[in-house]
C-alpha cells in the first residue's frame, strides 16, 4: 500500500505528461502520426489517466458545469475505473456532475446478463460512486429491430444536447476497432448496429464459453461521434496489441484500421505499456531513428531484424546491409560484417539444445542449462490445466524422458472455460452410473438443475464449479499420465483468487502466494518453468506469474534457491522473439 501511495503521488505530479503534444515533433518519433506516451506498466498508466479524468471532473464542478464522459469497456480501462473508485472513496471525488455515454453494447443483450456491458460498468464503476442513475447512458441491447435506427439516432442526439463529449476513453481491438467500429467503418458513421468481425468474436469466446455464444451484432458509437469529443485517450496494454497500435499510429488512415482515423483528431493521446508499444519504430528499431548505444541485447535484436527484413541468413549479411539500415556505428564498433555475423550465429546456436535439464557428462560452457545435478527436480507451473502441454509440451516430454523428477503445478482450476453443455453431459453420465445411489443422484440432480435453470445474469453454483474443475483436472491427469508423470507429482493448487465464478477475478492475496511457496519449499526445485505470456497484463497468465514472482521473492534467502533457475515459456498467446530466446529445445 505504501509503494502504491508513493506511485500515485509521483504520478499526480506528472499527470500532465499524457497531455497532448504534436505527434512526430521529436526526431525519433518522426514516423508517428498520433501522440503516444509509454509507461513501464499498465497500472501506472491507468492511474495517470484516472487523474486526468478526475481533474476534468473537478474543473467542471468549479465552473458549475456538467462533465460529459465517453466510457469504454473490456480489460483495458478496469484499472482506470479502480482508481476513480478509490479517489471517490478515499479523496471525496464526486461524480454528481458527471454524465456518461458508453461506447457500445452487444446485441441482443439483456442488461442483467453478466456478459453485458451494462453489467460490466455497474460492476466496475457505477455501483461504487455517487453518479446519478439518470446520468448513465449505455446502449440498450434489448431495443427491437424496428426501433433500432431511431434509437441510435437519438443516442447521438442526446450527446449533442449535452454539449458533446468532453472526454472519450477508448480501448483498441486486435482488428483496430474502437468501440465496435470494425474494419470497413466509415469516418462519417454515427451510432448504429454493426456485425462483429470474427476476430472480435473469437477474442470474446472465453467470456461467453465458446464463440457460438458470442452475439454476432452490437450497437456502437460511430467514428464521427467519437471524433467530435474534445479530448480522446486510447489505452492499449500487452503484446497482443503491439502490431495494431503500430498500424494505427504510424500507418496511413484507412477504413481497414478504424483506429487510424484518430490521426484526424487534434487532441488524442495513446497511453501504452511497454509491451503494447513494442512495434513502434522508435521501440522496435530505434537505430533507424536515433543514435543508440549498442549493447549485446540490442545487437542481437538488430541483426535478427535485419535478417528478417532482407530475407537473408545471418552469415550472408554484408557491410552494405548494415550501413543501409542505420547500423554503421555498430559496424564501426564491432565489425566488419563477417565478425558480427559469426558472433551472432554462435550466440543463437548456443541457445539450441535437446537437453532442457542439462546434458550429463558434457561441457556446459556454451549450453543454456547446467550439467549438474544430472537428475534435477523440476516444477512446471501451468496457469490453466493445459498451458503446460500447449506451450512447452516438447520440453515437458524431454524432461520426463531424460529422467528428471518433474512436478506439474496447475495454478487455477480452469473451471470457467468449461461450457455448460459439457458439464451437463458429464452430470448426466454420472446420474446414469449412480442411479441406484439416492444420495448421489440427489446431488447430481441439483447440479443438473443448476445448469439447466441458470439465468444469464447468474454465476455457476459451487457444485457446478466443482464439477467443471474436476473435468479440467482429469483432462490434465490424462496428459501427465501419458507423459509418464506420477500422479503424486501433479499438484492442483486451486489458487483462491480465481474462484469467483465469473470473469472478474480477485486480486492476488497472501493465501495464493503461500500455496505456491509451500510447493516450492516441498520440492526444492533446480528448475522452475512458468508461463511468461504478457499478451493480457490483467489476464490470468500474468496474475499467476506475479504470484510466482512474489513467492520467489519471499524464498530467495533459502539455500536451495541458489541452485534454482527460472525459465519463462510462451506459446498460448504468443512466442518469444528469436533474439529473446535463451533456450530453444
Language-model-detected regions and their locations in the chain:
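N-terminal glycine-/serine-/threonine-rich phosphate-binding loop
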Residues: 1-68, 363-365, 372
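Long, low-complexity, Lys/Arg-enriched
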Residues: 1-35, 277, 285, 294-351
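Short Gly/Thr/Asp-enriched flexible loops that form oxyanion-binding sites at enzyme active sites
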Residues: 80-87, 178-190, 538-554
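Conserved phosphate- and dinucleotide-binding cores of soluble alpha/beta proteins
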Residues: 1-13, 40, 44, 58, ...
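Structural motif
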Residues: 68, 99, 166-167, 231, ...
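Glycine-rich N-terminal segment of FAD-binding domains in flavoprotein oxidoreductases
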Residues: 59-90
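ATP-dependent adenylation/pyrophosphate-handling site
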Residues: 95-99, 103, 378-385, 389-465
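Metal-dependent de-N-acetylase/amidase catalytic core
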Residues: 201-209, 214-218, 311, 316-379, ...
Amino acid at each position: 500500500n505504501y509503494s502504491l501511495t508513493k506511485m500515485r503521488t509521483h504520478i499526480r505530479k506528472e499527470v500532465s505528461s499524457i497531455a497532448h503534444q504534436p505527434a512526430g515533433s521529436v526526431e525519433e518519433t518522426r514516423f508517428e502520426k498520433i501522440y503516444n506516451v509509454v509507461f513501464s506498466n499498465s497500472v501506472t498508466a491507468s492511474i495517470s489517466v484516472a487523474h486526468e479524468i478526475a481533474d476534468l471532473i473537478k474543473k467542471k464542478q468549479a465552473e458549475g458545469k456538467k462533465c460529459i464522459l465517453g466510457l469504454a469497456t473490456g480489460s483495458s480501462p478496469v484499472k482506470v475505473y479502480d482508481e476513480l473508485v478509490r479517489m471517490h472513496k478515499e479523496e471525496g471525488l464526486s461524480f454528481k456532475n458527471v454524465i456518461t455515454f458508453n461506447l457500445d453494447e452487444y446485441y441482443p443483450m439483456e442488461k442483467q446478463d453478466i456478459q453485458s456491458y451494462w453489467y460490466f460498468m455497474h460492476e466496475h464503476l457505477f455501483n461504487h460512486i455517487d453518479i446519478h442513475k439518470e446520468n448513465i447512458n449505455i446502449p440498450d441491447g434489448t431495443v427491437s429491430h424496428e426501433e433500432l435506427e431511431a434509437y441510435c439516432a437519438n443516442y447521438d442526439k442526446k450527446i449533442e444536447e449535452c454539449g458533446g463529449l468532453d472526454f472519450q476513453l477508448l480501448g483498441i481491438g486486435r482488428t483496430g476497432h474502437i468501440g465496435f467500429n470494425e474494419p470497413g467503418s466509415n469516418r462519417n458513421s454515427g451510432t448504429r448496429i454493426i456485425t462483429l468481425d470474427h476476430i472480435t468474436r473469437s477474442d470474446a469466446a472465453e467470456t461467453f464459453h465458446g464463440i457460438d455464444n458470442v452475439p454476432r451484432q452490437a450497437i456502437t458509437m460511430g467514428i464521427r461521434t467519437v471524433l467530435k469529443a474534445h479530448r480522446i485517450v486510447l489505452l492499449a496494454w500487452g503484446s497482443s496489441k503491439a502490431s495494431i497500435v503500430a498500424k494505427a499510429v504510424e500507418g496511413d488512415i484507412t477504413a481497414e484500421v478504424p483506429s487510424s482515423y484518430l490521426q484526424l483528431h487534434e487532441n488524442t493521446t495513446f497511453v501504452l505499456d511497454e509491451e503494447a508499444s513494442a512495434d513502434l519504430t522508435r521501440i522496435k528499431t530505434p537505430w533507424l531513428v536515433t543514435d543508440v548505444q549498442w549493447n549485446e541485447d540490442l545487437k542481437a535484436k538488430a541483426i535478427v531484424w535485419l535478417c528478417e527484413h532482407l530475407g537473408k541468413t545471418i552469415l550472408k549479411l554484408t557491410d552494405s546491409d548494415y550501413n543501409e539500415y542505420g547500423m554503421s556505428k555498430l559496424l564501426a564498433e564491432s565489425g566488419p560484417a563477417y565478425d558480427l555475423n559469426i558472433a551472432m550465429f554462435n550466440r543463437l546456436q548456443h541457445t539450441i539444445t535437446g537437453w532442457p535439464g542439462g546434458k550429463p557428462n558434457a561441457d556446459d560452457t556454451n549450453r543454456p542449462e547446467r550439467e549438474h545435478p544430472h537428475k534435477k527436480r523440476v516444477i512446471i507451473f501451468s496457469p490453466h490445466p493445459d498451458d503446460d502441454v500447449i506451450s512447452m509440451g516438447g520440453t515437458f516430454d524431454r524432461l520426463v524422458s531424460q529422467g528428471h523428477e518433474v512436478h506439474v503445478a496447475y495454478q487455477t482450476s480452469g473451471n470457467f472455460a468449461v461450457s455448460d453443455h459439457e458439464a451437463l453431459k458429464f452430470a448426466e453420465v454420472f446420474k446414469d452410473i449412480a442411479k441406484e445411489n439416492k444420495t448421489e443422484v440427489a446431488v447430481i440432480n441439483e447440479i443438473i438443475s443448476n445448469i439447466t435453470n441458470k439465468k444469464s445474469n447468474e454465476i455457476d453454483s459451487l457444485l457446478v464449479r466443482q464439477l467443471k474443475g474436476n473435468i479440467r483436472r482429469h483432462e490434465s491427469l490424462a496428459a501427465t499420465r501419458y507423459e509418464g508423470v506420477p500422479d503424486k507429482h501433479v499438484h492442483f493448487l486451486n489458487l483462491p483468487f480465481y474462484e469467483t465464478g465469473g470473469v472478474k477475478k480477485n486480486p492476488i492475496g497472501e493465501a495464493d502466494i503461500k500455496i505456491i511457496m509451500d510447493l516450492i519449499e516441498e520440492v526444492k526445485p533446480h528448475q522452475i518453468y512458468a508461463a511468461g505470456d504478457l499478451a493480457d497484463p490483467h489476464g490470468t497468465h500474468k496474475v499467476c506469474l506475479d504470484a510466482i514472482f512474489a513467492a520467489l521473492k519471499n524464498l530467495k534467502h533459502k539455500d536451495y534457491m541458489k541452485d534454482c533457475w527460472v525459465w519463462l515459456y510462451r506459446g498460448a498467446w504468443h512466442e518469444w522473439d528469436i533474439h529473446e530466446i535463451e533456450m530453444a529445445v
